[in-house]
């Protein structure tokens, strides 16, 4: 499902009073009062016509007009109050949607030696392996050496980070939990990792009220001896922390990870509308739009949305495909793509929009910013 933002309807007020019509009604009632005082009451002077014809007609008109005008004023006040509350609610949801996680360390091992830099050049130079699952560039590895490399690179990005390291989350496809990887992680960081098969623990960090310490998220999409090689080998590691804690500890933030928006089946257009309205992303200034998953369907959906919503896509390469270089996505495509986007944002100093859509038309949208909003 998409973000649980309520659809608040517009409140309609009563139509504005047509004063010219009420003046016509007043003249008609005054005329009727005069005629009735002359014919029915047989008034013979102006005072009787005024007292028994004009004055009652005017008072009746005044009562009716006052009642209608009061209802109109109440309706207008109710609409103003409704609009103010609606705007306040929208502002609160925008703040909720724009919450970020600070990334202070990011490591990516992929089939390409240069990582995301290979995908950022001219299109003719971008590696093309859309149907092939490839091994890591350094295919001769073991978990101990990988964890040692991750630790070394994270230490270079944020010296002495281990003093603030609080937890380690391991994201791995269901049925692929490996004791050897957990043992290697424990030996490297002296922390028992928590293992998950989804990004749920990452999602929960956005709404955490605690100023937690550093969290290391390691995502493993590697080949075992007996597993089918359906997706390329990619391994990532990220140091995640709340923006408040990052500012408090003067951490070197390299990117901001905005709240991830799940996609609803068949609701791509409405999801994009909600995303751009609440996430703070300026669609016209986005230079890097990345797609993964069902790329053909996603490309068609984006083109249709752009044509119908006056979205000027980047001229040179309006879309960048992760799968074009790294092949069919695996179960961990989303968290691995987030690490790729952080690396891309760090290399380009530009925001990155990730659109991940599965053949079932589920998936996620996420904006990765090259700096924090605050």
Annotate the PLM regions.
Residues 1-207, 221-222, 226-227, 236-374:
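Conserved "HGTGT" condensation-loop signature of ketosynthase/thiolase-family condensing enzymes
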Residues 209-215:
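Structured nucleic-acid-interacting core domains from mobile-element enzymes and related host factors
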């Amino acid at each position: 499902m998409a973000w649980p933002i309520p659809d608040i309807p517009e409140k309609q007020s009563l139509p504005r009073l047509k004063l010219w019509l009420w003046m016509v009604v007043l003249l008609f009632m005054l005329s009727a009062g005069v005629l009735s005082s002359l014919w029915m009451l047989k008034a013979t002077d102006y005072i009787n016509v005024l007292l028994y014809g004009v004055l009652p007609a005017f008072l009746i008109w005044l009562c009716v007009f006052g009642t209608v005008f009061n209802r109109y004023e109440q309706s207008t006040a109710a609409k103003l109050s409704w609009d103010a509350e609606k705007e306040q609610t929208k502002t609160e949801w925008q703040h909720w949607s724009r919450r970020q996680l600070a990334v202070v360390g990011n490591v990516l091992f992929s089939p390409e030696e240069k990582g995301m830099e290979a995908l950022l050049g001219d299109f003719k130079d971008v590696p093309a392996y859309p149907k092939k699952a490839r091994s890591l560039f350094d295919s001769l590895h073991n978990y101990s050496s990988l964890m040692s490399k991750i630790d070394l690179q994270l230490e270079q990005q944020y010296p002495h980070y281990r003093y603030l390291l609080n937890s380690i989350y391991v994201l791995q496809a269901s049925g692929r939990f490996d004791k050897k990887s957990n043992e290697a992680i424990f030996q490297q960081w002296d922390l028992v990792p928590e293992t998950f098969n989804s990004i749920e623990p990452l999602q929960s960090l956005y709404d955490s009220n605690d100023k937690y310490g550093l969290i290391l998220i390691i995502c493993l999409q590697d080949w075992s001896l007996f597993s089918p090689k359906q997706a390329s080998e990619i391994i990532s590691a990220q140091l995640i922390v709340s923006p408040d804690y990052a500012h408090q500890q003067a951490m070197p933030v390299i990117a901001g990870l905005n709240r991830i928006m799940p996609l609803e089946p068949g609701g791509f257009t409405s999801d994009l509308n909600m995303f751009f309205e609440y996430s703070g992303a300026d669609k016209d200034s986005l230079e890097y739009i990345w797609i993964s998953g069902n790329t053909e369907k996603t490309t068609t959906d984006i083109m249709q949305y752009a044509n119908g919503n006056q979205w000027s896509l980047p001229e040179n390469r309006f879309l960048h495909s992760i799968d074009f270089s790294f092949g069919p996505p695996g179960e961990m495509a989303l968290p691995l793509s987030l690490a790729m986007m952080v690396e891309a944002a760090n290399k380009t100093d530009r925001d990155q929009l990730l659109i991940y859509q599965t053949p079932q038309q589920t998936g996620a949208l996420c904006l990765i910013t090259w700096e924090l909003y605050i």
